[in-house]
């Protein structure tokens, strides 16, 4: 009977002494109420009936929700703040025996420092510098929780809610700002369109003026060429007249009356032709002695037939 009791006691003692710690946890061992050691994940053995499990500490990173609270900003705006805190225990002994309730302590510490940090900022800074706020809170809370064996990995501001009337005012301000930007963009578009139109008209006027300039140049060049040709024609006529005069002079010197009659008859007929073809002529010119005219023409014919050397010269 006693042997059976001893066997049962021994088996029970062995079972009680075996402790299997799950992954991600550390267990503290107390002996007569005093901390002795920390059990790591896996199979561990303790002294039965003397040692006991003190605290089962979760060593994994976890999230603590920070309750919302109202904070008065530097510019006296009542703002409601929500936040979360990411923690990881690095020392199970300190987390179990240096603070009575670790989670509540971290919540109160975070809320206190949120009031301190955000209370020194204006509302616009709170809304625009959320990353800086997170960094400041992380540094402060992490430093304060080091003696507790806790590592603060992140502190995040979830929401910043100004009062309802202030939100309405901000919405009206943003709407006015968007309207202002839209008006500015529209005015800028109109200005650019006017500039492009004026530039196009300017280029058109330049091209038109350039075309007129080229036209005037070509016209002047044409007139110059025409005057040059007229001058050359007059010069040739003058040379021909001088040559004819020379021939007549030579004929007079040599006593050739046929050449003289030819020259006079030619001048006479040309003058009659010009007077007759003029549009403003109102007087009909007739020779005084038609017989002399006919005789001159006959003389011209005879002269042409008999004396071709005159024209060859």
From Swiss-Prot:
Transmembrane segments: 1-21
Gene Ontology CC annotations of this record: plasma membrane
Compartment annotation: Cell membrane
Keywords: Cell membrane, Membrane, Plasmid, Transmembrane, Transmembrane helix
Species, as recorded: Wigglesworthia glossinidia brevipalpis
Name of the molecule in the record: Protein QmcA
Family: Belongs to the band 7/mec-2 family.
Cysteine-cysteine disulfides: none
Pfam families listed in its UniProt record: Band_7 (PF01145)
InterPro entries, sorted: Band7/mec-2_domain, Band_7, Band_7/SPFH_dom_sf, Band_7/stomatin-like_CS, Stomatin_HflK_fam
Gene (UniProt): qmcA
Lineage, uppermost ranks: Bacteria, Pseudomonadati, Pseudomonadota, Gammaproteobacteria, Enterobacterales
Mode of membrane association: Single-pass membrane protein
């Amino acid at each position: 009977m006693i042997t059976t009791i001893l066997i049962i006691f021994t088996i029970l003692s062995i079972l009680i002494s075996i402790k299997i710690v799950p992954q991600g946890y550390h267990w503290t061992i107390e002996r007569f109420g005093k901390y002795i050691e920390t059990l790591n994940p896996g199979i561990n053995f303790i002294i039965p009936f003397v040692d006991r499990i003190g605290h089962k500490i979760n060593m994994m990173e976890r999230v603590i929700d920070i309750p919302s609270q109202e904070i008065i900003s530097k510019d006296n705006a009542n703002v409601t703040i929500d936040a979360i805190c990411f923690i990881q225990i690095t020392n199970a002994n300190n987390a179990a025996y240096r603070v009575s309730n670790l989670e509540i302590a971290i919540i109160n510490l975070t809320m206190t420092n949120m009031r301190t940090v955000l209370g020194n900022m204006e509302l616009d800074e709170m809304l625009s510098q959320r990353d800086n706020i997170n960094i400041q809170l992380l540094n402060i809370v992490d430093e304060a929780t080091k003696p507790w064996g806790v590592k603060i990995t992140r502190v995040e501001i979830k929401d910043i809610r100004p009062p309802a009337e202030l939100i309405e005012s901000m919405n009206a301000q943003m709407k006015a700002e968007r309207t202002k930007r839209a008006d500015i963009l529209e005015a800028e578009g109109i200005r650019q369109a006017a500039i492009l139109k004026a530039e196009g008209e300017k280029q058109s006027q330049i091209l038109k003026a350039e075309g007129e300039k080229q036209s005037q140049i070509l016209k002047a060049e044409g007139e110059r060429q025409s005057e040059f040709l007229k001058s050359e024609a007059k010069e040739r006529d003058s040379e021909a007249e001088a040559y004819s005069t020379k021939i007549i002079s030579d004929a007079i010197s040599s006593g050739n009356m046929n050449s003289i009659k030819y020259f006079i008859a030619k001048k006479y007929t040309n003058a009659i032709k010009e007077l007759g073809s003029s549009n403003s002529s109102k007087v009909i010119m007739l020779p005084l002695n038609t017989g002399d005219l006919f005789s001159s023409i006959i003389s011209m014919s005879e002269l042409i037939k008999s004396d071709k050397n005159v024209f060859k010269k």
